[in-house]
């Protein structure tokens, strides 16, 4: 059990030095903070998926995947003639 604690201490030290040690924990200043950030981000995505439904969530991902630093996904889709069905984005009542 002590090795588990040592490992957590090492990960915490790395996190305090600015390294991301938990997937999805970017921006956390400690191991615990990164764990909380990752958990919240995951839960937020699941909630959004429930609100939009599988199809809407997938369509929104397509649009987001088209975005670049220079233009939004919507701008790029319009420019390249890619059809994005935004009616699928509506939340389920």
UniProtKB/Swiss-Prot annotation:
Chain segments carrying region Disordered: 1-93
Induction info: By abscisic acid (ABA) and osmotic stress.
Keywords for this protein: Stress response
GO-annotated biological processes: response to abscisic acid
Basic and acidic residues: bias regions: 7-19, 32-62, 73-93
Job of this protein: It is thought to provide protection for the cytoplasm during the desiccation stage of embryo development.
Remarks, miscellaneous: Wheat contains at least 10 different genes for Em protein.
Family membership: Belongs to the small hydrophilic plant seed protein family.
Cited PANTHER family: EM-LIKE PROTEIN GEA1 (PTHR34671), EMBRYONIC ABUNDANT PROTEIN 1 (PTHR34671:SF19)
Name of the protein: Em protein H5
């Amino acid at each position: 059990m002590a090795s588990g604690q040592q490992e957590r201490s090492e990960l915490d030290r790395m996190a305090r030095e600015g390294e991301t040690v938990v997937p999805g924990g970017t921006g956390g200043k400690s191991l615990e903070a990164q764990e909380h950030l990752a958990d919240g981000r995951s839960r937020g995505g699941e909630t959004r998926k429930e609100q939009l439904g599988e199809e809407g969530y997938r369509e929104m991902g397509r649009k987001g995947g088209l975005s670049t630093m220079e233009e939004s996904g919507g701008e790029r889709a319009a420019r390249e003639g890619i059809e994005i069905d935004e009616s699928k984005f509506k939340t389920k009542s």
